[in-house]
Amino acid sequence: MEKRWWKESVVYQIYPRSFCDSNGDGIGDLNGITSKLDYLKELGVDVIWLSPVYKSPNDDNGYDISDYQDIMDEFGTMEDFDRMLATAHEKGIKIMMDLVVNHTSDEHKWFIESRKSTDNPYRDYYIWRPAKEDGSLPNNWGSCFSGPAWEYDKTTDMYFLHLFSKKQPDLNWDNPVVRQEVFDMMNWWLEKGVDGFRMDVISLISKEQPELPDKEPGINGYATFNVSANGPHVHEYLQEMRQKALNNADTITVGECSGVTLEEAKKYARSDEKELNMVFQFEHMDVDSDEKAGKWTTRKMDLRDLKKILTRWQKGLQDIAWNSLYWENHDQPRSVSRFGNDSDEYREISAKMLATCIHMMQGTPYVYQGEELGMTFCPFNTLENFRDLESINAFHELTEQGKMTEEEMMAAIGYKGRDNARTPMQWDDSANAGFSGADATPWIMVNPNYTKINAKDQVSREDSVFKYYQKLIKLRHESDLIVYGTYDLILDDDKDIYAYIRTLGDEKLIVYCNFSENTREVELPEEFTDGKILISNYNDAKVSEKITLRPYEAIVIQK
């Protein structure tokens, strides 16, 4: 397997609005990020994935871009960005931008022109359709933010497609001029010095045009936003992107690929690097979803399902393509509350167990801000405390349709809502968790547990979650076995324990992760009985023929 720097790296995702506020307006900003680069250097990460900082009216927290070559006013200026980039590079940290090119803001100059007339030069930058003969919508596609994916525009008496909010019209990637605009913009950022791109919902860019056929409807009566996943020209367009925007740069690229299958992922991220370095798949993020309600449920996962999914991706991409490893991001709730145990007794120990489980696999690990502290779900309590369009719209839609009660939906959005990941970073135990000045009002509520979960405490404490992540990252930097070794699942049917073996040549390690409060005994394979402990979340762990795994214990033994 060919060695590449991005395979050996650990990526840290920053959601700028919630990371660090330098000017007291309650909103995180670029200068706040710059002020915390030493913290990230101490953690040991190699790359920052920066969620969107471009000019935006902020309908969807920056994923609605009105100018790709300017900075959102709330985040600072281009000079602030340049200073952050230069400072990160001085500290040996690369910057990966969030590339949002399935859609723009409806306030982008392209769309402002596009909607003016049917013969405007920018008309075909977007996807416009008339109503059907009976006056109904062009098709039954739905927005992932609830409701239909079509918005009527009276100026030309036509509808435009938006797979997300109605302020996020989809670009028409079948137009070669649009593609060149995107490639030119990417090259502009690469010339500025950025090190790569995380590509938002990139699997959705190619639609089945001109037909745009109806699809199977979901719970709300519309076909879901995966209607255009892995479309007819997506691989062709990404190969063109590689040739026209990425070929001259040693970049890191990861595609967020909604609806991606294992076979499709092999095409996106195959080792010949004609498209992307790796993809984000979401199958393991649906492990606790419900057939009826989709993600809007509070049900717990069955560990055996998780093992099947992650093992299929580990084995399926082995020697063919490259995995992205993650529990959290800005769209997913906090992993320690979701997959671990966020009680005072087990929060830190289970956060370390989850980290061990994912960081010992083959692939590039991603750490989301606050994950390295074991940040938890936030008790939002009332709908007014939520900020995320997806949660608010789903609440109204599903309760008004009688599909779920208000009580059920409040529980569901409290458990699965994206705002769980977006509460302010907990820096210390001062007012507003040190995210913002004491007199500021943060844009979203601070989790009240910041007095006991914060970076200041954890950086100073040797047994903290932060220090454990630091050790895991250091181990990966030092070990080809962890980075490049093959993966084999053991104890397949065990409902409590996730265990697997990594192999590279004559080197081997075994990983045990107890996902439960149960104490369990396992028999260590003979080849490991003389091995050494690489890392464990219990200080007194020992190697023996039979290992007793305490609640949420993780242990890694190298032979």
For the regions a language model picked out, list residue spans one by one.
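Active-site and adjacent substrate-binding regions of carbohydrate-active enzymes
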Residues: 1-559
